[in-house]
Regions:
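N-terminal loops that bind phosphate or other acidic moieties
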Residues: 1-297
Length: 297
């Protein structure tokens, strides 16, 4: 899910919105980090333009004309949530529905497992804001440096999230209102994918903190959704611990990753393949005429 966030106007990231478009284009040409990793596991990467702000990349190519991108743009990025709601309720619903539609499309193509991923400058700010509001905790506990901020930048990021929560009284708001007020199109799309997993009975492998935030919102909106979700890795962002505790999940990989794009989720694919191979073809103790061990734990 590729989308931009209006909150970048507040200097919460060292990168500009042009980076979102450039990385999405690299995904379309199968050159990005997640594409290289997915190729190793035999997975297909589907970059979705659900809200990229820039219309062109430095080469002059237009995002809307690019092959290899699923064009589902709702708007050219969200609004600056410090000044107004990030998106309208209608836009938020459309983003959620888009995520569900993508899972349906994958199901109809015979795909049997899906990994989530996202690309969008400023989305660690939106995800931290959603996490703090839904968990009703101090933003300091769930807000990290994202793609890279100074201590001063981190403090500003935490302060503006706290300001938005106070301004919109989000500790008392329902998850959908929180999502539409301070979230992003990418997060809303991922919420839809989580829900779609339950609807179409497809396991969804969650990537990092942003996917986990989407999973929490999905579970709050539609209890039971999490039964179709598999956590992949524990990244650097501080929100991960609280989110996993709330969802009662335990990520398999602890690599302190912060690469994004869905790379952590794709890494789990390889481990799942190995586990499945062992499950289906591995020799049992009885098959080797070895006495079964007693279980003490």
């Amino acid at each position: 899910m590729c989308a931009d966030n209006g909150i970048v106007e507040e200097n919460v990231s060292q990168s500009g919105q042009d980076v979102t478009a450039i990385v999405a284009a690299n995904m379309a040409s199968r050159k990005s980090s997640v594409c290289l990793m997915a190729g190793y596991t035999g997975a297909q990467v589907i970059p979705v333009d659900i809200g990229i702000a820039c219309e062109t990349i430095p080469s002059g190519k237009k995002i809307d004309d690019m092959d290899g991108i699923l064009h589902k743009k709702i708007s050219h990025g969200t609004k600056n949530f410090l000044k107004e709601h990030a998106m309208t309720d209608k836009q938020c619903i459309k983003a959620i529905e888009t995520g569900k539609e993508i899972v349906k499309m994958c199901s109809e193509k015979g795909i049997n497992i899906i990994a989530t991923g996202e690309m969008g400058i400023g989305n660690t700010t939106t995800s931290s804001a959603v996490a703090a509001a839904v968990l009703r905790c101090d933003p300091i506990l769930v807000t990290g440096k994202g793609a890279g901020l100074s201590e001063e930048g981190l403090l500003r990021k935490q302060q503006l999230i706290a300001e938005a929560i106070r301004s919109y009284d989000l500790y008392e708001a329902d998850p959908f209102t929180v999502l539409s007020t301070v979230g992003g199109f990418d997060i809303a799309g991922l919420v839809g994918m989580c829900v779609g997993g339950a609807l179409f009975h497809l396991p969804i492998v969650l990537d990092g903190v942003i996917s986990m935030v989407a999973a929490l919102v999905a579970e709050r909106l539609f209890p039971g959704t999490k039964e179709y979700l598999l956590p992949s890795h524990k990244g650097k962002e501080p929100a991960v611990e609280l989110l996993m505790k709330e969802l009662q999940m335990e990520p398999v990989i602890d690599g302190k990753m912060a690469l994004g794009e869905g790379t952590g989720a794709v890494m789990l694919f390889a481990l799942l393949d190995m586990a499945l191979q062992l499950y289906e073809t591995g020799t049992t103790f009885s098959g080797m005429q070895i006495s079964v061990y007693k279980r003490f734990t």
